[in-house]
Amino acid sequence: MSTQTAHVLGINEQQEFGGDPSPLTAHGIFCGIRASVKHKFGSADLSGIRVAVQGVGAVGYHLSKQLIAAGAEVFAADINLSNVHEAQKLGVQVVNVEDIVSYHADVFAPCAMGAVINDASIASLNAPIVAGGANNQLASPQHGEMLRKRGVLYAPDFVINAGGIIEICRQYQDTSIENCYAQIEKIGDTLAEIFQQSDDQKKCTSIVAEQLAERRFNGQSGALVGSAA
């Protein structure tokens, strides 16, 4: 597409407006995991927190790197052996692909395929937090409520993985990277608000996030990610 039109972003560093947004997507997820851990356990400190990452490609790799730097223990699986080998260099511990969803961890971070949260995976899930970068994580809307009833805190995918689109917006608008990071780091604040409203209203976080999005689209009050999203 980029050979036919100038209206394609996020491909490589030779573009006029910049390249791969994956590191910024990962940073937003990292901020979101910290907010999730704080809400669930009372502290945003990731030291010793066990994170099971499903998929260590472009986003999962950068996320794992940040998590390890923050003191977390990272366990990961990927069908691509090259991705696995690169992740091992970071200190990631490898888990079988078929075991990653049910792995005993504090956080399950899906960063690969969509629809990974479904009837079967919810039944086998052993992490009290689901917070990752994959798109369309819920196989159907009902699975958000199923997670809530199981006591699993879910960070809605379109909120926690918004760092990439915020970066793409920066590339197009040609604004500073500092402003971009400031906007991305608001993802944690937005999730904290969603989590609190979910508790107060006894609604699943996915519904609360969608309602906040609708309010923003309609020009009503209600925080959502930051001015770039």
Residue ranges and their predicted role:
Residues M1-T3, S64-A69, E86-K89, I165-R170:
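Short acidic, glycine/serine/threonine-rich loops at helix termini
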Residues Q54-G57, Y61-H62, I68-Q88:
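NAD(P)-binding Rossmann-fold cofactor-contacting core
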Residues I11-G19, S102-V107, S124, A162-G164, ...:
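Short, basic, helix/turn surface patches
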Residues G48, I79-V159:
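Rossmann-like adenosine-cofactor binding region
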